[in-house]
A protein has these predicted regions:
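Short beta-strand/loop segments at the ligand-binding rim of alpha/beta enzyme cores
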Residues: 47-60, 108-122
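Conserved anion-binding
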Residues: 2-75, 86-89
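Alpha-helix N-cap and loop-to-helix initiation/capping positions
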Residues: 6, 97-104
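Glycine-rich, proline-tolerant flexible connector loops at the mouths of alpha/beta enzymes
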Residues: 82-100
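C-terminal helical cap(s) of enzyme catalytic domains, especially alpha/beta-barrels
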Residues: 8-24, 148-166
Length: 166
């Protein structure tokens, strides 16, 4: 997952850095941690690892939304993930996840992904009704919470259980 990918140049650089040849320029050896450091034919190995690697580029600014079609058209990109909190902040509408500008941004990214056979993703929206609305529109890579929110939910359950024992 790569944050703040605003343009084609940055997107291409991320593909180059994250993918093995022929898609990128990541260094290759015959034994990698992805295959338990066993020796493999590197020609086949690079293809297998490239196909098993998910490259997610975050769309978090109006510029990135404007460039979504071009970014989605880059070979080696799998998901365009809208970072909704950051996008709202950049647009000057903090927390307004159902604002027309955000809905339009979602539609733009979804259309770009559908056109190029990529997956549209969303993060930062955890209201079930809004999530359902955006999933219905075409979001397919869904962040349904954050590490911190999941840990805090578990901690609250544990704290309540302990308080019940006291």
């Amino acid at each position: 997952v790569v944050p703040h990918v605003d343009d084609v140049i940055t997107a291409k650089k991320m593909v180059s850095n994250c993918r093995y040849p022929p898609l990128g320029h990541r260094s290759m050896t015959g034994s990698l941690p992805q295959v338990n450091f066993e020796s493999y034919d590197i020609g086949n190995l690079s293809k297998e690892i490239n196909s098993a690697t998910l490259l997610v580029l975050m769309i978090e600014t109006p510029q990135a939304v404007d460039n979504a079609n071009a970014i989605a058209g880059i070979d080696g990109v799998d998901v365009l993930l809208i970072g909704t909190n950051d996008l709202c902040m950049e647009m000057g509408i903090p927390g307004q996840f159902d604002h027309k500008s955000i809905v339009d941004a979602y539609d733009t990214v979804i259309e770009a992904c559908e056109k190029h056979g990529k997956h549209a993703g969303m993060g930062g929206v955890y209201n079930p009704e809004l999530m359902a609305r955006y999933i219905t529109r075409g979001m397919r890579f869904i962040l349904s919470g954050s590490d911190l929110s999941f840990m805090m939910a578990g901690a609250k359950i544990q704290a309540a259980a302990i308080r019940g024992l006291i």
